[in-house]
A protein has these predicted regions:
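Acidic, glycine-rich loop-and-beta core segments that form the ion-binding/anion-interacting portion
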Residues: 1-7, 16
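Gly/Ser/Thr/Ala-enriched C-terminal appendages of enzymes
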Residues: 12-203
């Protein structure tokens, strides 16, 4: 028996592909073209390094904050550790920015402050059944500090990230839901205090 494969070629925007799939188009493959290689929807990755702390001779850190006229752009000062908090089903509920050295434990209530100053509920409490630190040193003293994963392990890790670490609503192409990122009261206090010292206002 002969098998006929149907391909839809030429550059296709992702919205067009979504519409074709919704209409049950019978194509085996799509030629996305330069819409994929140029990341047409988000062609620029906005990543900027900013100084948040200075290490002192005794090994401790002094928090630093860049001056900004906009409270919404105020960076989070200090040496920090981000955590991921999970519910009883093993689903990630949110990420939490804590000061380095703060202890976040599973089974104990965690008070969190919403990064959005306009949020209806600025402070919430959640008891995670599991927690995981997200900042893992890969290079220490100029040397590799971890065992590099295999390609199969990388694929399994990404698959787990998409199924257990991310909500379905965060993956949709149109109006995706924001991933919740909160901060501990200690982080919020440090940020507000330093912003007030620099600008005389609240954040």
């Amino acid at each position: 028996d002969k098998v006929l494969y149907l391909y839809r070629l030429l550059p296709i925007p992702f919205r067009t592909i979504c519409q074709m799939l919704y209409e049950h188009a019978h194509f085996d493959s799509y030629g996305v073209g330069e819409n994929l290689i140029t990341s047409a929807s988000d062609p620029v990755f906005g990543g900027v390094y900013k100084l948040v702390a200075v290490k002192k001779p005794d090994g401790s850190y002094t928090p630093k904050m860049k001056c900004s006229d906009s409270a919404s752009k105020a960076i989070i000062p200090g040496k920090k550790m981000p955590w991921r908090l999970y519910d009883e089903n093993g689903q990630a509920q949110c990420d939490l920015i804590a000061m380095d050295g703060e202890v976040i434990e599973a089974g104990k209530p965690v008070t969190m402050v919403n990064l959005d100053s306009d949020a209806i509920e600025r402070t919430i409490t959640f008891t995670p059944t599991a927690v995981r630190p997200l900042l893992v040193p890969h290079i220490v003293g100029g040397k590799l500090a971890i065992e590099l994963p295999s390609i199969a392990e990388k694929k399994a890790y990404i698959a787990k990230q998409l199924t257990e670490e991310t909500w379905e609503s965060e993956l949709r192409l149109e109006c995706p839901h924001k991933h919740y990122v909160n901060m501990t009261p200690a982080v919020a206090e440090c940020r507000s205090r330093m912003y007030a010292e620099l600008h005389g206002g609240k954040v």
